[in-house]
Regions:
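C-terminal GPI-anchoring signal of eukaryotic secretory precursors
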Residues: 669-683
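Catalytic-domain carbohydrate-binding cleft regions of carbohydrate-active enzymes
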Residues: 24-45, 82-84, 95, 106, ...
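Cleavable N-terminal signal peptides of Sec/SRP-targeted secreted and luminal proteins
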Residues: 4-22, 681-696
């Protein structure tokens, strides 16, 4: 194990290419910058400057222009000192590339460097690379299909950093954090690309370049902050305070406590009145609770009509159906997407002639989505379009008895590119997502979206992008945890996990279905138990009675801990702290905690260690600093963390979890309502037996 407290990322910023560095420029060798050193070098790829920061937390000198280091014969170069008491600052211009470096000296416990590089030269690409470093773990970055945790081994091949369908980047906040307590935050209004482990192996590089999907601007700008703190938790708290909006409230509490039931994975597009009624009845007959029943794809006459198909084979009397479901105690929600297919002629032509579709620079409005080869997408940055869209939804709610909505898509990439959107050009195209989520959040805190960009303030659930029915890091069960952690680090703590067992797609074909195995289904639910909500589509009773019993148990356990989930959500509202943090959150200086990707916390009081490996019936568990009560088997044994428990027995029916000791005492002193009910005992009998066998072997 190699950890260096002296480690600090090296930045090289290369303003490369063409006109800028075509001329020979004589460079200064180095300039003192705060407590670090700024040095320049040049090679055939362009100009580089490097900031080498020493461990100088106590240094508070203002910037020296380092006159003695400046090559005076450089005509195209000027250096100015712009310091105040709070900031060390240096500005220099090389040809027309204007570089401003600022260093925050006001906070003695930290060191924040602020870098702005501006150029109005055409075709310029400005980059900054952070060396990921041996033995350093990195967290954050985008939501991704192949979701790792930590993320330093991820590969990104010079890719535009905005909300997009490709690689499942539905959340793209420009924020990374290292186990050394360093954060990198980039101005979201950047024509940003990232490259990791591709052009520069071992580095995370950010770039600004004015090419599609970004709109043309007459300058290129890269602005970022590097914050350095004693550990990742302190760094994250500082970053949240500085850059993230906190949610204004918590989402719908019934959606937290009781499962959402979606028709999607089980029925795909073959939904109708009969099927919905049958589904509802099965849920009740099997003794499960529900927050809502969601009617998913395909209920419309055509995609984008927002009109129920009232044929006999579909929904002949939707109001009658929702009335009956309401009588049974269900709320009814509806899948809605922002597209209109070209063959949905009546509605398409209204939106087209009114200019409601997102268009590219040439006025093209055609796009493609998973249920429409020829379609267009509503422009959510156009107020009139939003008004038209939302008023149709409101009318539909009234006429069809719909309580709330599941809003799909919403990533900026669905618009033809480069899209011409209303609003700040610098924020285009992700401003699409920003306005999408904001417009739809007006339907209340019982909605769900699946994308976010600078929308952490909204009191709504954000769903993980569709998960696949698999055991692998390629979008399978292990990524239920890693995606949870990444979303939380990006400030989105109201995570709606995708459906239990995944979507059951066969080879990515949306309308075919392959059930998850019993084992995968149960392990998936267990992993989901202490996440903010449970969403079913495949059902336990399609397996066997044991599955039903186990699933009922963990669904109940989730509900029993709903008050704890809400407490953690209130902490996010108040302080910006993650609802489901990684285990290092409670042990931020312990290097053993950093790379644990198969455990998570609920608030700071529950530690969850699900089995996510096929066939496994034991696992190793890391407990971070603190006193923990083993709640798994109801024995409440005490463990002092940090410690490892090796080969902890966890047969199929068992989810290992631990309760922080003082919280456990609070619960025990109370009504005990939070503690697992006695119905768990039966489930655990065989597990306890397994434990005994294990102990006596
Ligand atoms: C960079 O350029 C943009 C556009 O001209 C300007 O708005 C911004 O203030 C500049 N930043 C700095 C630090 O000069
Ligand atoms: C990145 O490039 C490498 C090498 O060309 C390739 O193997 C890999 O599939 C690419 N990854 C992505 C996500 O495009
Ligand atoms: C960019 O172009 C706009 C419009 O032509 C102009 O107002 C603005 O000053 C320009 N900005 C820069 C940094 O050149
Ligand atoms: C409604 O659904 C039925 C059955 O799938 C289909 O045949 C019919 O074309 C649809 N009706 C409309 C108006 O789209
Ligand atoms: C509803 O859909 C199911 C499955 O596709 C089908 O078997 C059934 O006939 C449909 N119900 C009606 C009333 O058409
Ligand atoms: C827009 O039209 C011009 C001229 O035909 C063409 O060169 C350009 O590629 C088009 N841009 C897009 C995004 O289609
Ligand atoms: C989409 O449009 C193209 C070009 O007009 C056409 O060839 C194709 O058949 C259309 N696809 C569908 C599903 O209608
Ligand atoms: C569950 O057990 C009941 C009897 O208690 C039996 O009727 C039913 O068929 C069983 N269901 C399954 C799915 O095994
Ligand atoms: C259903 O909800 C009730 C009341 O909140 C709760 O006591 C019960 O445990 C829940 N049952 C299941 C199977 O989740
Ligand atoms: C996690 O880090 C430890 C060192 O702290 C190392 O021994 C272990 O192999 C790492 N595990 C993984 C899965 O990378
Ligand atoms: C461990 O946690 C306790 C409080 O539970 C705290 O006082 C102590 O400083 C922590 N130790 C480390 C190494 O973080």
């Amino acid at each position: 194990m190699w950890v260096s407290s002296m480690w600090w990322p090296v930045l090289f910023l290369c303003a490369a290419f063409g006109a800028v560095f075509g001329n020979e420029v004589t460079l200064p060798v180095s300039v003192k910058f705060g407590d670090g050193l700024l040095s320049f070098s040049k090679n055939t790829n362009g100009l580089f400057y490097t900031i080498n920061e020493q461990d100088g937390l106590t240094v508070e000198n203002s910037i020296s222009t380092g006159e003695s280091n400046v090559a005076r014969n450089n005509q195209e170069y000027t250096l100015t000192e712009c310091s105040t008491n709070e900031e060390a600052c240096v500005e220099f211009i090389i040809n027309d590339v204007n570089v401003i470096l600022k260093k925050d000296l006001s906070n003695r416990a930290s060191s924040v460097s602020h870098v702005v590089v501006n150029s109005s030269t055409d075709g310029v690409r400005i980059g900054a690379c952070v060396e990921l470093g041996d033995g350093v773990d990195w967290f954050g970055g985008p939501e991704a299909k192949y979701q790792l945790w930590p993320v330093q081994d991820a590969q990104w091949n010079y890719t535009a950093y905005y909300t997009k369908e490709d690689d499942a980047v539905a959340i793209a906040e420009p924020y990374w954090l290292s186990s050394q307590g360093t954060y990198l935050y980039v101005n979201p209004a950047t024509s940003m690309f990232i490259d990791q482990n591709y052009l520069n192996e071992g580095s995370l590089c950010i770039y600004a370049e004015n090419v599609t999907p970004y709109r043309e601007r007459n300058y290129t700008s890269l602005e970022y902050w590097i914050g350095r703190y004693e550990d990742p938790r302190t760094a994250h708290e500082a970053a949240v305070e500085e850059f993230f909006a906190k949610p204004t409230d918590v989402p719908d509490e019934r959606m937290i406590a009781q499962p959402v039931w979606s028709t999607w994975a089980r029925y795909k597009i073959y939904v109708n009145d009969t099927i919905v009624r049958q589904y509802a009845q099965e849920i009740l007959d099997n003794g499960f609770n529900h927050s809502q029943l969601e009617i998913d794809d395909f209920w419309e006459t055509c995609y984008g009509s927002l009109t129920f198909n009232t044929s006999d084979e579909k929904f002949p009397d939707i109001k009658g159906l929702t009335d009956d479901l309401h009588d049974l105690g269900f709320r009814v929600t509806l899948w809605v997407h922002p597209f209109i297919n070209v063959d949905c002629t009546e509605y398409y032509s209204i939106a087209e002639s009114a200019g409601y579709f997102a268009k590219d620079v040439n006025g093209t409005i055609l796009t493609t989505w998973w249920q429409g080869e020829n379609a267009s997408v509503i422009d959510f940055t156009n107020e009139a379009a939003v008004e038209w869209f939302t008023s149709r939804l409101t009318a539909l709610q009234a006429s069809a008895g719909i309580d709330s909505f599941k809003f799909d898509a919403g990533e900026a990439s669905w618009a033809p590119e480069p899209a011409v959107l209303t609003g700040n050009v610098e924020e285009s195209p992700s401003i699409y997502t920003y306005q999408f989520a904001r417009a739809l959040a007006t339907f209340g805190n019982g909605i769900e979206v699946r994308t976010g960009w600078q929308t952490q303030d909204l009191a709504i659930f954000v769903r993980m992008l569709d998960k696949d029915t698999s055991w692998t890091f390629e979008n399978g069960l292990p990524t239920l945890i890693t995606t949870l952690l990444v979303m939380n680090l990006a400030g989105y703590g109201f995570v709606l996990p995708d459906m239990v067992g995944g979507n059951g797609y066969i080879d990515g074909v949306l309308v075919s279905t392959q059930y998850p195995s019993k084992e995968l289904f149960i392990r998936w639910l267990q992993a989901n138990t202490f996440m903010p909500s449970i969403q079913y589509s495949f059902v336990p009773w399609d397996y066997d009675n044991e599955t039903v019993e186990i699933c009922r148990t963990y669904t109940e356990l989730h509900e029993a801990y709903a008050p704890t989930i809400i407490e953690a959500m209130n902490a996010l509202v108040a302080n910006g702290t993650p609802v489901n943090p990684p285990v290092w959150w409670l042990d931020p200086t312990n290097s053993e905690a950093y790379n644990i990707s198969d455990e998570y916390l609920l608030g700071e009081v529950i530690l969850v260690a699900p089995v996510v490996v096929e066939g496994a019936v034991t696992r190793d568990i890391f407990l971070p600093n603190g006193t923990w009560r083993d709640a798994t088997y109801g024995t409440y044994d005490i463990y002092e963390g940090p410690t490892w428990i090796y080969d902890y027995p966890a047969p199929l029916e068992v989810l290992p979890y631990f309760v922080e000791s003082s919280y456990w005492e609070t619960l025990s002193a109370g009504s005990g309502a939070f503690l697992p009910s006695s119905s768990l005992t039966a489930i655990y009998t065989s597990a306890i037996l397994a434990l005994l066998i294990q102990l006596f072997n």
